[in-house]
Every structure is written in structure tokens, then in C-alpha cells.
């Protein structure tokens, strides 16, 4: 059944991509690859879809120049992309400098550096989508973090699977499914220390809160994900209705 599980996880994501129309045939996709489990898994899935959907894939790796392992991470990503014949663009960005200059935390500076690099690459290659490896656990953490920090219904929908040209094909799988898949496939990854977003609060939620919620119900993470889906559908509907009523009430001059 291990083989079946592996196929299942892949198919789950492929179905999700189809159902949510995240990728069209012939798309050029930029994918951020840190070398961590999540982005390696997403890279393998896009690579699986490459022929059938006639995709062009370009990987982007950001060397944050913070950790000693940064060079190893970069080499790992370059080697993996080499094996898959996927071009890989490397950005060396001094995140500490940015943080100092822009007066932001290292996490924020790292995120800014990543999205800037994605946008640049997208423009350069005239690509269609940027694929990010956020999964269900990230979604649950974001939701809980926003709820605790204070949010309204529009903020509670957390991350969308499609945000303009940004896509998140892994929002249908949990972290443990990703790790299980990679282990069974014999695929290595690097431990990703750059994931310490808003370090303290996020880590508390990841390491303390979610495990406790899973003690109450082991499907807690999926259930939060479903709630986020519902909220997104409701807010999208509301926004459309409000715009329609507004247009009905206003006359062209």
C-alpha cells in the first residue's frame, strides 16, 4: 500500500490543480525551491506534469547568505534541478542588509527577497505563474495566527490557492503526507531553517498549539483548511454581490 499512498498523494495534488484550474496547458511556471521538503515535493509534482501539460519550468533558489549551510542548500538544489533537467536561477541576497536598511525582521526581509526574485524572474521569462509550496499545515498556522492576532472575515480566509499569478498547489496536503512521500520515494531534502516566519508566535502555534488540537481531533489541520475554503468562498461571493449592487446603484454620467 506504500506504493499506492505515494501515487495517492501525487494524484491528490494533481486533482487539486485540475479542480482549481491552477495551471493551464503550456504554462511557464516559476517555482521557488529552497531545498526544503515542501518545495522539493512541489518540484517533483510539476516535473511529473511537465510532459502531459506541456509545461516550461524554471526553478528559483535564493541564497540568503545567513546560514553556514546556505552553500550546501544551493548545491543540493542545483544538483536536483540538474537531474530533472530543470533550469535553476540562483539569487544571492544579503537578507541581513535588507532587514537593516528597511528596518524589518529577518523573516520579513527574507520573504521580500523571495517575492522580489520571483517577480524579476517571471518578468524576465514572461512566465505565467509562480508556484509556492505552502501546504495545509502552513494554512492552519496562518489561520490561527491571524485569529489570535485579530482579524475579520476577510483576513480569516488565510492563504488562497490562487492569488493573481501566484499559485499554491499543495494547500490540499499536510506536511506529514509530504515527508512520507519523499521518504518512500527515497528523495532527500535539506532542513529548511528559513521557515521561521514571525519566529516566536509561529513556532508556538506550530509546535505547541497544533499538536494539542490534533490530540482533540487528528484531522484538526484538514478541518481548519476546509473552514478557510468556506470563508474564501463566502468572502468572494460577498465581494461580487457588493460590486454588483454598487454598479446597479451608480449611473454613468
PLM regions: where:
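Core alpha/beta nucleotide-donor-binding catalytic domains of modification enzymes
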Residues: 6-33, 37-210
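ATP/NTP-dependent adenylation/nucleotidyl-transfer catalytic domains that generate, transfer
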Residues: 200-253
Amino acid at each position: 500500500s506504500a506504493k499506492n499512498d505515494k501515487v495517492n498523494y501525487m494524484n491528490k495534488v494533481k486533482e487539486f490543480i485540475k479542480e482549481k484550474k491552477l495551471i493551464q496547458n503550456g504554462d511557464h511556471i516559476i517555482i521557488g525551491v529552497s531545498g526544503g521538503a515542501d518545495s522539493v515535493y512541489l518540484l517533483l509534482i510539476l516535473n511529473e506534469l511537465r510532459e502531459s501539460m506541456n509545461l516550461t519550468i524554471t526553478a528559483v533558489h535564493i541564497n540568503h547568505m545567513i546560514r553556514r549551510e546556505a552553500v550546501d542548500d544551493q548545491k543540493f538544489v542545483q544538483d536536483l534541478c540538474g537531474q530533472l533537467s530543470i533550469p535553476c536561477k540562483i539569487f544571492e541576497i544579503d537578507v541581513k542588509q535588507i532587514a537593516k536598511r528597511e528596518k524589518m525582521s529577518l523573516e520579513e526581509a527574507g520573504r521580500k527577497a523571495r517575492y522580489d526574485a520571483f517577480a524579476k524572474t517571471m518578468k524576465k521569462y514572461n512566465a505565467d505563474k509562480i508556484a509556492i509550496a505552502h501546504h495545509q499545515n502552513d494554512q492552519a498556522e496562518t489561520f490561527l495566527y491571524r485569529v489570535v492576532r485579530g482579524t475579520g472575515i476577510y483576513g480569516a480566509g488565510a492563504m488562497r490557492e490562487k492569488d493573481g499569478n501566484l499559485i499554491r498547489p499543495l494547500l490540499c496536503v499536510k506536511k506529514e503526507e509530504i515527508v512520507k512521500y519523499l521518504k518512500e520515494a527515497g528523495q532527500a531534502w535539506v532542513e529548511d531553517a528559513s521557515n521561521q516566519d514571525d519566529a516566536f508566535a509561529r513556532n508556538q502555534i506550530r509546535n505547541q498549539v497544533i499538536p494539542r488540537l490534533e490530540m482533540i481531533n487528528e484531522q484538526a489541520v484538514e478541518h481548519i483548511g476546509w473552514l478557510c475554503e468556506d470563508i474564501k468562498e463566502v468572502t468572494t461571493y460577498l465581494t461580487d454581490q457588493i460590486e454588483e449592487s454598487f454598479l446597479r446603484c451608480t449611473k454613468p454620467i
